Amino acid sequence: MAHKKGVGSSKNGRESESKRLGVKIYGGQAAIAGNIIVRQRGSKHNPGENVYISKDHTLHARVAGVVKFQKKRDNKSYVSIIPFEA
């Protein structure tokens, strides 16, 4: 007979924390300079006019304006900012 009670070990509890990726400012919405437009892994969306990409592939607005998503001839998605009229 066992002199110690058999203790099971859990096989749960390993799920990683979500990274909150995705589009943060959609097409037609306003953005100010420095705003995060898209958080992504890899370049799913590419930077267009007035948008820059950071080292983790996040797209940011370079100037204040309206966000525009478009696909070009190469069928890649590009994100641009159309500046507000001064």
From Swiss-Prot:
GO cellular component: cytosolic large ribosomal subunit
Entry-linked Gene3D superfamilies: 2.40.50.100
GO biological process: translation
Keywords, in A-Z order: Ribonucleoprotein, Ribosomal protein
UniProt-listed InterPro entries: Ribosomal_bL27, Ribosomal_bL27_CS
GO MF annotations, alphabetized: structural constituent of ribosome
HAMAP family cross-referenced by the UniProt entry: Ribosomal_bL27
Identification of the protein by name: Large ribosomal subunit protein bL27
Organism: Flavobacterium johnsoniae (strain ATCC 17061 / DSM 2064 / JCM 8514 / BCRC 14874 / CCUG 350202 / NBRC 14942 / NCIMB 11054 / UW101) (Cytophaga johnsonae)
